[in-house]
Each structure stands twice: as C-alpha cells, then as structure tokens.
Amino acid sequence: QDWLTFQKKHITNTRDVDCDNIMSTNLFHCKDKNTFIYSRPEPVKAICKGIIASKNVLTTSEFYLSDCNVTSRPCKYKLKKSTNKFCVTCENQAPVHFVGVGSC
C-alpha cells in the first residue's frame, strides 16, 4: 500500500462517517473493521517525517478517530467515535499502513 491508498482508506473530512455506504465500496470489500482519521492529510503525513525505512510509529498527539465495525452481514456497520493516539507504518516519510489505536 502507498500514501495515496492510505489516504483513501483512512483519512476523512467528517467525523460522521457513513460506515454502511463507504465500507461496501470496492476499496474495503465489506471488511470487518476500518479506522478513519478525521484530519487533513498533512498532519498525518508529518508523523513520518524523516523516516525512510519501514518503521511503526505512534502519534505523539491524539486525533479524532471513527471506527466502522461490522455488526452483521452483508456490510452492516456500527460507528464508534473516539479520540486517541494511533500507530502507523511509515515508509519514505509517509504512512502506508494503519497498525492500530493506542499503541504499536
């Protein structure tokens, strides 16, 4: 995965993510869970500043997060909002994989 794909999968301009709609798209294929970061792309990319080789990094500050968790098949989800730190895999000074919430 690359930075552009990471942005499409994890960065949003709304806290009220329409989970049922977005998770049914070809980008997600009804996967069990996805976390969205409510932010402009620049602050998220800055997490990886100076990191070239693949490395997991925990944010130093908290972000608004929106989790879409599957509740039933096919493609029915519940939205859970939170504020927390998160961990990403950085490569070539950009996030390429969302590792998890709270810790690496």
Swiss-Prot record:
InterPro entries: RNaseA, RNaseA-like_dom_sf, RNaseA_AS, RNaseA_domain. Its EC number is 3.1.27.-. SUPFAM superfamilies: RNase A-like. The active site is at residues 10, 97. Substrate binds at residues 31-35. Disulfide bonds join 19-68, 30-75, 48-90, 87-104. The keyword Acyltransferase does not apply. The modification Pyrrolidone carboxylic acid is found at residue 1. Basic protein with antiproliferative/cytotoxic activity against several tumor cell lines in vitro, as well as antitumor in vivo. It exhibits a ribonuclease-like activity against high molecular weight ribosomal RNA. Belongs to the pancreatic ribonuclease family. This is Protein P-30. It comes from Lithobates pipiens (Northern leopard frog).
